[in-house]
Amino acid sequence: MVHAFVPPHLLDFAEYIQNQEYSAEHYDLQCIDRTIVNRAYLSTYLHVQEWILNNGPYNDVKDYCEHDIGYHAAICIALNELNKKAMSKKYAEFIELRVDAHYNIVTIITPKDAQKALDLAFQIQNALQ
């Protein structure tokens, strides 16, 4: 019997665990890959935010937006405004990868995803020197 106060996302997670046959080693490796994606993203987020504030006319990344949106989406808009459209697209791709790694527990994160995160971090940070 399911308790009335169990959030639906926890039930989804429990069902997911029941349907998987993970070994301890596989789970540990996926945790490492998720950590790599998250740390690569967050270091890039801080680097890009600092670059925008140093190279743009505003004192806050959100000043580039007409509507109240989060900082992560605001960074994409700010990069577009500062003529860094290619980096804006890469950053948006990085956001999607980070969301999958950090919030979507049913998404399998592989070493290939971790390497992609490192590549995106390297490309974006080097382009904004």
Regions found by a protein language model. Give the residues of each.
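Terminal alpha-helical segments
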Residues: 1-129
